Amino acid sequence: MRREAERLQDMLDAISAIERYTSQGRQAFDEQELVQVWVVHHLQIIGEAANSLSADLMNQYAEVPWAQIVAFRNIVVHEYFRVSLNLVWAIVQNNLPPLKATVERMVQELGEA
């Protein structure tokens, strides 16, 4: 089983990939199906990694909506055709920046422990 620090790094790697794929803006995202699929895939990775974190660690960082992250992953995996591109874009723009900042802090604090 992978350690929590590795799962957190998986999350950061996925966020970095999403940032690269979406750097050209909303219009490019809307026009490029491959980018849409790749972004959704990386959101799935984030949800999978979050799902593997211990309850203790998630409780220490309760400001993160862990349950929503995992729930979105479940929708992506099991009900893919319900995924709204507007919602995906909103997650990328509004939710990933604070998640990235918190996960970076988590990695740093775990490294210091």
Which stretches of residues belong to each language-model region?
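Solvent-exposed interaction patches of small proteins and small membrane subunits
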Residues: M1-A113
